[in-house]
């Protein structure tokens, strides 16, 4: 089994059969059930981690390869990096980073109290290098746990897709408060026309590009335009915003699974430098 990866500005083009499937599956889940799913979102994720423990997701050792910002503490000896992993799950991204770089200090939070407990039980967990807490990013103020404008990078990796589209902007506004000016949110999540989107059965659709799994957890599939507008409207500047295509090929079984992700960086604008004494006096003379 092999995996091939490439990047591009446009999402995957569907086959005729795939297009027909999406056209057939237009019926939406009832408003009553959608309200119930929103109300029980935390419970459903907690049950997910109860069923799967720490075994569902693989450790993500690719993040430093894809995001050079996570390597920025390697430029000189003693350099530190303060990270927020927003939506840390059970630590599949967090612990590879802490293990790889001793100069990283991480804040990490998750919607699920059970996931937070698993992080604290991990053999690599060290309270001196990591502060972990439960948080609903759409409602709970990160400033209760993190000083304002103190974080060098924020990771949002397969997190925002689990949030209702009408509440996604609240997550971005929340992390904006703790991110240093001139620093970036590092994003990767499901892209439009991903194989997982096409596997949903009829009766799973909640809205445009938004679906519910059998266990009650939800997933949104992003376009680059939707994501860019979401970030820019929250005050960020676009740095990179592109699709990542991965094909997992099993030649023995004749299978090819086309995955589509969106990988992006959005920067909090740097603060304008304070005017010097000379420039300030010139301004006074002008006016």
Curated annotation (Swiss-Prot):
Under Enzyme Commission nomenclature, its number is 2.1.1.-
Q: Which Gene3D superfamilies match?
A: Vaccinia Virus protein VP39
- Record keywords: Acyltransferase included? no
Which controlled-vocabulary keywords does the entry list? Answer: Cytoplasm, Methyltransferase, Nucleus, S-adenosyl-L-methionine, Transferase, tRNA processing
Q: Where is this region: Disordered?
A: 267-287
Q: Output the Gene Ontology cellular-component terms.
A: cytoplasm; nucleus
Matching entries from InterPro entries are given as:
Methyltransf_12, METTL2/6/8-like, SAM-dependent_MTases_sf
Where does the protein principally reside? cytoplasm
Q: What class of enzyme is it?
A: transferase
Q: List localization entries.
A: Cytoplasm; Nucleus
Residues binding S-adenosyl-L-methionine: 45, 49, 87, 110, 136-137, 157
Q: Which reaction does it catalyse?
A: cytidine(32) in tRNA(Ser) + S-adenosyl-L-methionine = N(3)-methylcytidine(32) in tRNA(Ser) + S-adenosyl-L-homocysteine + H(+)
Q: Which GO terms describe its molecular function?
A: enzyme binding; tRNA (cytidine-3-)-methyltransferase activity
An example GO biological process term is: tRNA modification
Q: What does this protein do?
A: S-adenosyl-L-methionine-dependent methyltransferase that mediates N(3)-methylcytidine modification of residue 32 of the tRNA anticodon loop of tRNA(Ser), including tRNA(Ser)(UGA) and tRNA(Ser)(GCU). Interaction with SARS1/SerRS is required for N(3)-methylcytidine methylation.
Q: Which family does it belong to?
A: Belongs to the methyltransferase superfamily. METL family.
Q: Which PANTHER family match?
A: METHYLTRANSFERASE-RELATED, TRNA N(3)-METHYLCYTIDINE METHYLTRANSFERASE METTL6
How does the record describe its quaternary structure?
A: Monomer. Interacts with SARS1/SerRS; interaction is mediated via tRNA(Ser) and is required for N(3)-methylcytidine methylation.
Would you tell me the protein name for this molecule?
A: tRNA N(3)-cytidine methyltransferase METTL6
Species this protein is from: Rattus norvegicus (Rat)
Organism taxonomic ancestry: Eukaryota, Metazoa, Chordata, Craniata, Vertebrata
């Amino acid at each position: 089994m092999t995996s091939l990866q490439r990047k591009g500005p446009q999402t995957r083009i569907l086959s005729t059969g795939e297009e027909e499937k999406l056209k057939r599956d237009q019926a939406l889940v009832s408003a009553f059930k959608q309200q119930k799913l929103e109300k029980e979102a935390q419970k459903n994720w907690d049950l997910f981690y109860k069923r799967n423990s720490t075994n569902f997701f693989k450790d993500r050792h690719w993040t430093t390869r894809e995001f050079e910002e996570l390597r920025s503490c390697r430029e000189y000896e003693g350099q530190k990096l303060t990270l927020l992993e927003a939506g840390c799950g059970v630590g599949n991204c967090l612990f590879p980073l802490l293990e790889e770089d001793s100069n990283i200090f991480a804040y990490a939070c998750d919607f699920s109290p059970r996931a937070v407990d698993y992080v604290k039980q991990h053999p690599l967990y060290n309270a001196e290098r990591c502060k972990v807490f439960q948080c609903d990013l759409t409602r709970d103020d990160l400033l209760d746990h993190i000083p304002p404008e103190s974080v060098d990078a924020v990771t949002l990796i397969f997190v925002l897709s689990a949030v209702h589209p009408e509440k996604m902007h609240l997550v971005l506004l929340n992390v904006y408060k703790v991110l240093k000016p001139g620093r970036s949110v590092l994003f990767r999540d499901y892209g439009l026309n991903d194989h997982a989107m096409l596997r949903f059965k009829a009766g799973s659709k909640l809205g445009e590009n938004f679906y519910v799994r059998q266990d009650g957890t939800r997933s949104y599939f992003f376009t680059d335009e939707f994501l860019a507008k979401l970030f820019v409207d929250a005050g960020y500047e676009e740095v990179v915003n592109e699709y990542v295509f991965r094909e997992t090929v099993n030649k023995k079984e004749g299978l090819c699974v086309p995955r589509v992700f969106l990988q992006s960086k959005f920067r909090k604008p740097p603060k304008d430098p304070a005017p010097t004494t000379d420039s300030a006096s010139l301004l006074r003379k002008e006016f």
